[in-house]
Amino acid sequence: MNFLLSWVHWSLALLLYLHHAKWSQAAPMAEGEHKTHEVVKFMDVYQRSYCRPIETLVDIFQEYPDEIEYIFKPSCVPLMRCGGCCNDEGLECVPTAEFNITMQIMRIKPHQSQHIGEMSFLQHSKCECRPKKDKARQENPCGPCSERRKHLFVQDPQTCKCSCKNTDSRCKARQLELNERTCRCDKPRR
């Protein structure tokens, strides 16, 4: 289904591009030269915005948050990272191949020292549009406490352990006793 949808998108993009190219009378321009009213062609926009590795300036502190005693020069580095659009809100642009790159960075310890050292950073070499991970499933990996009467239970998100909202003392105050299996206050057994 996704392949068919992508194929339709590309076919439509190609038709629009060819139709526009047929009627445009654009003169060739030198590299770096821009027309005042230049219009970027649809296919160029589409290809440049689709999910792919793209050079991104990344703050070194984002990659090394524990190295707060240093000032880095430069403070950010150019890295290839996945970015772009996937043409479907259910998909996200994610890396499928990565590698490390080592760069020389000046590390400055204020009022003490400075030196050029090597630091390793992660780069993305391949990207794909893949289904977004279900955030609700990631946030709560625990199964439900009970299929019925869920409102009677409370669940510890760390251990997934279920316990009763009712307490034994609350049940006893009503001359009842807590049934720990159902989490209800029942009449005492005789």
UniProtKB/Swiss-Prot annotation:
Similarity comment text for this entry: Belongs to the PDGF/VEGF growth factor family.
Gene: VEGFA
Compartment(s) of residence: Secreted
Role, per record: Growth factor active in angiogenesis, vasculogenesis and endothelial cell growth. Induces endothelial cell proliferation, promotes cell migration, inhibits apoptosis and induces permeabilization of blood vessels. Binds to the FLT1/VEGFR1 and KDR/VEGFR2 receptors, heparan sulfate and heparin. Binding to NRP1 receptor initiates a signaling pathway needed for motor neuron axon guidance and cell body migration, including for the caudal migration of facial motor neurons from rhombomere 4 to rhombomere 6 during embryonic development. Also binds the DEAR/FBXW7-AS1 receptor.
Chief site of localization: secreted
DNA damage keyword on record: no
Species: Equus caballus (Horse)
Keywords, in A-Z order: Angiogenesis, Developmental protein, Differentiation, Disulfide bond, Glycoprotein, Growth factor, Mitogen, Secreted, Signal
Glycosylated residue positions: N100
Protein name (database record): Vascular endothelial growth factor A
Subunit (UniProt): Homodimer; disulfide-linked. Also found as heterodimer with PGF. Interacts with NRP1. Interacts with isoform 2 of BSG. Interacts with CD82; this interaction inhibits VEGFA-mediated signaling pathway.
